[in-house]
């Protein structure tokens, strides 16, 4: 189950990161990217909701995702005018990626109830680094861009189609046989770093707290900077740096989740956002430096890559930690839908970078630094203010 979901996530990665690096170079294509991100973020919410309630089977959801994702990549491979690309890539491709993302996350979280956030973090990492081979191929040989996207379309349709055939939800109240539920529930080390919520929140209750909008704002700011980094690093022409950036974007997610189990979600999220902000400052220095620009570029890529994707699974795990596990999927889907605003923010930064790249990177640094400062102040909703959690 896990490896099929991971492969499906990797297959949709070129739709976001491949397009952002290779094709988002002017206002029209940047607008298409923003629409795609909005559709992908919005598509994940109903997909997860319908799959969780049994109104849409995992097979049907992923089969539709396979067809639409393949269509979106094919539309990117052979652009036939802005309106057609808008429908094929941005609208249908974005919806297809959202279906795959939502279904795979729900299936993996259900099969691994003892460590749902860590496992989901691993498969969302594939959504980051899955585009690295395409970026290297098309980056080294720009004339092969259409062929690379066409191959990605065929692979996406095939891989997600196979996942649709085999992925399924576990039985109700599933728990793995090799994990003692009592020992897991009373694990002092786990409770110290991931405290239990005050109660199990329903979606309507979570929407009335201050914590949920704060998480959505953090995701919006960090998500905008993450996508913007792919665009701005691709503009340097260093395709090895772009590939490393997206690879670290994915790998950093699993590393951050491991660290969060030791140091706590909020502390690691603050560190991740700080690294993302530091990456922007290094990249801004690189684009203005007369000497040493290469070293600064690579340092910026490392920091921006490690911070540019890790916040996604950390926010997902914080939703579970703060609001409870019963409706965590629905609540996180609402938070994740804020990625639609992140896409618009990324495009705004990219448009600014066309004329003033250093200023755009400094603005991105501020956009990442503000939530980094606010993250340690996140509190468990429902507890009295005198309790320091």
Language-model features: where?
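Extracytoplasmic gate region of multi-pass secondary transporters
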Residues: 19-24, 201-257
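Symmetry-related core transmembrane helices of the 12-TM Major Facilitator Superfamily/SLC fold
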Residues: 146-166, 359-377
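C-terminal transmembrane helical hairpin of 12-TM major facilitator-type secondary transporters
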Residues: 219, 243-318
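A late C-terminal transmembrane helix in Major Facilitator Superfamily
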Residues: 322-355
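Hydrophobic core of transmembrane alpha-helices in multi-pass small-molecule transporters
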Residues: 10, 84-99, 220, 295-310
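C-terminal ends and interior cores of transmembrane alpha-helices
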Residues: 13, 67-80, 275-291
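Intracellular juxtamembrane helix-capping segments at the cytosolic ends
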Residues: 98-112, 119, 310-323
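Helix-to-loop junctions at the C-terminal end of transmembrane segments
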Residues: 43-58, 253-265, 354
């Amino acid at each position: 189950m896990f490896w099929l979901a991971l492969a499906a996530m990797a297959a949709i990665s070129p739709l976001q990161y491949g397009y952002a690096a290779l094709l988002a170079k002017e206002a029209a294509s940047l607008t298409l990217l923003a629409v795609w991100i909005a559709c992908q973020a919005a598509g994940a919410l109903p997909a997860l909701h319908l799959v969780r309630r049994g109104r849409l089977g995992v097979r049907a959801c992923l089969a539709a995702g396979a067809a639409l994702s393949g269509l979106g990549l094919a539309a990117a491979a052979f652009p036939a005018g802005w309106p057609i690309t808008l429908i094929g890539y941005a609208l249908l491709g974005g919806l297809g990626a959202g279906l795959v993302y939502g279904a795979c996350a729900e299936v993996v979280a259900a099969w691994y109830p003892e460590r749902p956030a860590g496992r989901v973090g691993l498969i969302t990492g594939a959504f980051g680094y899955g585009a690295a081979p395409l970026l290297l191929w098309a980056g080294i040989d720009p004339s092969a861009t259409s062929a690379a996207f066409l191959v990605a379309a065929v692979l996406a349709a095939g891989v997600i189609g196979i996942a649709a055939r085999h992925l399924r939800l576990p039985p109700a109240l599933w728990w793995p046989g090799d994990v003692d539920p009592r020992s897991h529930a009373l694990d002092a080390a786990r409770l110290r770093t991931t405290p239990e919520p005050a109660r199990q929140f329903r979606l309507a209750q979570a929407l009335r707290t201050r914590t949920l909008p704060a998480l959505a704002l953090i995701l919006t700011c960090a998500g905008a900077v993450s996508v913007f980094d792919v665009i701005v690093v691709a503009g340097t022409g260093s395709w090895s740096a772009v590939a490393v950036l997206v690879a670290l974007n994915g790998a950093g997610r699993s590393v951050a989740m491991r660290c969060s189990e030791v140091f706590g979600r909020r502390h690691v999220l603050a560190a991740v956002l700080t690294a993302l902000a530091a990456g922007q400052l290094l990249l801004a220095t690189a684009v203005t430096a007369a000497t040493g620009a290469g070293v600064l570029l690579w340092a910026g890529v490392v920091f921006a890559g490690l911070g540019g994707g890790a916040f996604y699974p950390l926010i997902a795990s914080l939703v579970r930690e703060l609001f409870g596990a019963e409706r965590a999927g629905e609540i996180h889907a609402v938070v994740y839908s804020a990625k639609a605003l992140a896409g618009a923010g990324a495009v705004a930064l990219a448009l600014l970078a066309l004329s003033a790249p250093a200023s755009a990177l400094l603005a991105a640094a501020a956009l990442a630094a503000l939530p980094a400062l606010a993250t340690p102040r996140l509190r468990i909703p429902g507890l009295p203010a005198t309790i320091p959690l």
